[in-house]
Amino acid sequence: MNLDHPKLVRLLRMAYSAEKAAAFAYIGHAGSVKHPDEKIAIKQIEMDEWGHRKTVLSIMRQYGIPVSWWNEVKYHLIGKTISLSCYVIGWFMPYYFAGRLESGNVCEYFVMMHYFNDLGITEHDDELYEMGIKEKEHEIYFQKSIENNRLLPLFEKIFGWGTANSFNDVDLGNKYSVKASKAYCQHRNK
């Protein structure tokens, strides 16, 4: 079955490649931190990203959606560049920008769910929900890691993400069910 939804196809192809960039970035991030608990947590996030990539590819294959080799090259280079930069930009910035990135990624999976549902397809709801919630958990991990850093207010003012601002409306303390989660990220569902 082919999907007649160009936005969904584009989002799936981008998410597949962007997960590789994120995983590569977390390899560098984990390597650059000194505390063993931080290394373990970031390594787990890296593994989650590889898992998301595998799940997205499975969905793409189900609908005959080819991988974008342009995205693969682009995001490969982005991920490797970020990975290397983690060793030179200090402790705060990798945490900040990882959290900011994860905040936006939350909605990618809920928007995919919306697009599939627009086509009458609900079979991917559970896995897309789980990936969106996992991205939110990643966002919260990075957010809590820097919440008391003196640079956070400045970065939040400049880049629009931090303890007071998120790019999604998911609240882990009051999670919606899979069915009700269709209310998430409506601001991005355009």
Named regions from a protein language model:
Residues 1-190:
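Non-heme di-metal
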